[in-house]
């Protein structure tokens, strides 16, 4: 008897974001603190999010997945994420994305916004990008390492130049 191992027809895509402080104005500086890392998997239309955050100046109150018009741009919430009402903890959630939301994810338009008591309109923010190597600040890297260019539609590096 011969047994063949079959790979799934569609492999899951991995994404990540580092969520960090995003003060809306100079008065919020001391209140907008903390950091986090979030990993996500897209399996067809199921988007599963797992991550951690820490260092908030006050307890978290809510976290949501959003879709903006561009990477770095803001937009409406897609849905709520699970978080503890604490200064540190885990972030999680599972969403069924629409085709437009899947396309937005692939263009870097989906992001997380975590609110806290001292920054109720966004304490930590981060836009999802394809999973990539990250290293500590000041660590040199060799070779092709930069985040894929989402603008050329290939997700494989700098936009290609055409001679035609």
What name fits each language-model region?
Residues 10-63, 67-164:
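Metal-centered catalytic cores of metalloenzymes
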């Amino acid at each position: 008897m011969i047994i063949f191992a079959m790979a799934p027809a569609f492999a899951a895509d991995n994404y990540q974001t580092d969520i960090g402080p995003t003060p809306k104005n100079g008065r919020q500086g001391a209140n907008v603190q903390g950091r986090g890392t979030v990993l996500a998997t897209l399996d067809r239309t199921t988007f599963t999010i797992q991550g951690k955050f820490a260092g908030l100046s006050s307890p978290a109150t809510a976290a949501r997945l959003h879709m903006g018009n561009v990477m770095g741009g803001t937009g409406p919430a897609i849905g709520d994420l699970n978080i503890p009402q604490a200064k540190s903890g885990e972030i999680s959630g599972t969403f069924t994305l629409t085709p437009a939301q899947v396309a937005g994810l692939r263009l870097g338009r989906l992001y997380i916004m975590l609110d806290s008591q001292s920054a109720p309109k966004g304490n930590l923010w981060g836009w999802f990008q394809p999973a990539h190597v990250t290293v500590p600040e000041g660590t040199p890297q060799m070779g092709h390492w930069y985040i894929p260019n989402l603008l050329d539609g290939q997700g494989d590096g700098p936009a290609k130049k055409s001679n035609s």
